[in-house]
């Protein structure tokens, strides 16, 4: 009997995309649904996203944003190294921090950093950045098969699910293990499209199938909300165009070029 798992990450306060994703998942009715963390950042009114997730009782991991907000830290702990990336990240963090109530902080503080499942005999590890570090970026172009295999063996899993980079990808390893970056639903995937993506995995007795589902939502309504909240115009432009305008210095060249090629193709 097949078992399906839906997973998404990087909500980034995009409550309209979250609502659309949850509706799509609800129609498909997988046996398991997980959010891999990062409630806030980038978008408007983070409490709206918190209310949606808590009302559904959806299991969620603690991302770097959730840890920082929950524990009253001064920045998002995103792991950026470029000053421009960090400057925009700080604007986003300060807004989120100022618009989250104590009940939500307590909830975020209590979230687990990782989770383990066994689905049709496959050991599944869910985390935010990587099993090693909550804010580690696992980029497709920078992760060799050997490294990903080591990561799975070292952390005792057959299927590894992560997020944090904002770009979705899947690697089927020669040994039969799988690594899946589920991407983010809080902003588009830097491909000139305004939809967002989540991952759906199907576990059969002898195989694992991995797919990504695009979800449309009212991105223009979100852009107007962001403008009303006086969030940076650069953030709003990303929602309206499907192209990232901030935190790009952290993205490897191959990811930038591949996304450009997909949009042009």
Model-derived segments and spans:
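Beta-strand-turn-beta hairpins that frame and shape the catalytic cleft
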Residues: 1-6, 117-125, 174-178, 205-209
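N-terminal active-site segment of His-dependent metallophosphoesterases
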Residues: 1-58
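Active-site neighborhood of phospho(di)ester-bond hydrolases with catalytic His/Asp-centered motifs
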Residues: 8-9, 33-38, 59-64, 127, ...
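Active-site environment of divalent metal-dependent phosphoester hydrolases
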Residues: 12-17, 41-44, 65-70, 159-173, ...
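Glycine-rich phosphate-binding loop signature in dinucleotide/nucleotide-binding domains
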Residues: 25-30, 119-120, 153-156, 200, ...
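Active-site neighborhood of divalent metal-dependent phosphoester bond hydrolases
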Residues: 49, 56-117, 138, 142-156
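Anionic-ligand binding region
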Residues: 145-185, 196
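Acidic, His/Gly-rich catalytic cores of divalent-metal-dependent hydrolytic chemistry
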Residues: 172-265
